[in-house]
From Swiss-Prot:
It comes from the Bacteria. It comes from Polaromonas sp. (strain JS666 / ATCC BAA-500). Pfam families: PNP_phzG_C, PNPOx_N. Belongs to the pyridoxamine 5'-phosphate oxidase family. PANTHER family: PYRIDOXINE-5'-PHOSPHATE OXIDASE, PYRIDOXINE-5-PHOSPHATE OXIDASE. It catalyses: pyridoxamine 5'-phosphate + O2 + H2O = pyridoxal 5'-phosphate + H2O2 + NH4(+); pyridoxine 5'-phosphate + O2 = pyridoxal 5'-phosphate + H2O2. Pathway: Cofactor metabolism; pyridoxal 5'-phosphate salvage; pyridoxal 5'-phosphate from pyridoxamine 5'-phosphate: step 1/1; Cofactor metabolism; pyridoxal 5'-phosphate salvage; pyridoxal 5'-phosphate from pyridoxine 5'-phosphate: step 1/1. Its EC number is 1.4.3.5. Keywords: Flavoprotein, FMN, Oxidoreductase, Pyridoxine biosynthesis. The keyword Flavoprotein applies. SUPFAM superfamilies: FMN-binding split barrel. This is Pyridoxine/pyridoxamine 5'-phosphate oxidase.
Length: 216
């Protein structure tokens, strides 16, 4: 028996878990992000550190993908990847990017915009060396974003580099970290009747943050 056709347009949810107001939110968006991320972790949201990364190519065509945040502080949000991947090449041509976290279970979204730079070689080395061995070999084995004939290419490459490096693969020169330095944050909390809470933080010339409420 075939499944009934789902009416996508009729799918909707009422958001009633929480609220976000100026008095209860932090004046510093990094502190607000830290609070929300830790609440997502405590709520056992699947992969709470997963975020969508948006970049733009030389023809102004945007692209997105999901990456994992591996660190954050006053300097920005950090993730690691292949510098020769599509996102790496696009960031080399246009360093401005946007991030989005969507914690469905908490009815929350965080959007972050800013300029991106590579982290230091020392930071990349430290994180690379903390990864499981198969992940380190995988960084060598996968020519990310390139066309390959079949999955066997990856399997063969992994075996080759595993035999070459044994237990001590060095960090590939084409692999490392990026840091997005935020100049704009938005925090969205779902509310009843689609009257959601939405706060925007904009970086000012004196390095302070302007907090404003936006209509949802």
């Amino acid at each position: 028996m075939s499944n009934p056709i789902i009416d996508i347009a009729a799918l909707r949810k009422s958001y009633e878990r929480a609220e976000l107001n100026e008095d209860a939110s932090h004046a510093d968006p990094l502190k607000q992000f830290d609070q929300w991320l830790n609440e997502a972790i405590a709520a056992q949201v699947p992969e709470p550190n997963a975020m969508t990364l948006a970049t733009v190519d030389s023809k102004l065509r945007p692209s997105t993908r999901v990456v994992l945040v591996k660190g954050y502080d006053a300097r920005g949000i950090v993730w690691f990847t292949n510098y020769n991947s599509r996102k790496g090449l696009e960031l080399a041509g246009n360093p401005y990017a946007a991030l989005q976290f969507h914690w469905v279970e908490l009815e929350r979204v965080v959007r972050i915009e800013g300029v991106v730079e590579k982290v230091s070689a020392e930071e990349s080395d430290a994180y690379f060396n903390s990864r499981p061995l198969d992940s380190r070999i995988g960084a060598w084995a996968s020519p990310q974003s390139e066309v390959i004939a079949s999955r066997s290419v990856l399997v063969t490459n992994a075996a080759k580099y595993g035999a070459k490096f044994l237990l001590q693969p060095p960090r590939p020169p084409h692999w490392g970290g990026y840091r997005l330095q935020p100049d704009n944050w938005q925090f969205w909390q779902g509310r009843k009747s689609r009257l959601h809470d939405r706060l925007r933080y904009t970086l000012q010339a004196d390095s302070s943050w302007l907090r404003e409420r936006l209509a949802p």
